[in-house]
């Protein structure tokens, strides 16, 4: 498993220690051209616009997150693993409309009617994501 270079980690640690959380999130995720675009701003913007148009949201509501954005995993269990061909691309859609639809759907599910795998998946999702504002 390839890991991120030490200089990048040192910069992240320095930012985490010296800067407000809002700055760190903006610099490393929200305001960053994701590494999957190799610095190609035009393709990045066109991709965001395409996704936003298909979902009916503003392109500012589309945020690439995770290792596809930073170039490495921020998950402490993954040891700063570098984004590679086996990595997925995580995209956050910031939308009250879609959040409410998903929230209602999730709350209305009768997990007793689902198979064990589906039931466990929904219960894990509720436990780890929903109450943090993520669906």
Question: PLM features: what roles do these ranges have?
Answer:
Residues 1-87, 94-135:
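Catalytic core of pol beta-like nucleotidyltransferases
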């Amino acid at each position: 498993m390839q890991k991120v270079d030490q200089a990048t980690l040192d910069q992240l640690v320095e930012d985490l220690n010296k800067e407000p959380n809002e700055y760190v999130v903006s610099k490393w995720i929200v305001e960053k051209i994701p590494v999957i675009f190799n610095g190609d701003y035009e393709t990045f913007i066109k991709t965001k616009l395409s996704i936003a148009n298909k979902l009916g949201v503003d392109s500012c509501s589309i945020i690439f997150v995770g290792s596809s954005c930073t170039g490495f995993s921020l998950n402490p269990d993954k040891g700063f693993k570098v984004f590679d061909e086996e990595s997925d691309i995580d995209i956050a859609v910031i939308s009250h409309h879609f959040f409410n639809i998903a929230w209602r759907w999730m709350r209305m599910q009768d997990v007793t009617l689902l198979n064990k795998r589906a039931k466990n998946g929904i219960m894990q999702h509720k436990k780890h994501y929903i109450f943090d504002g993520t669906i």
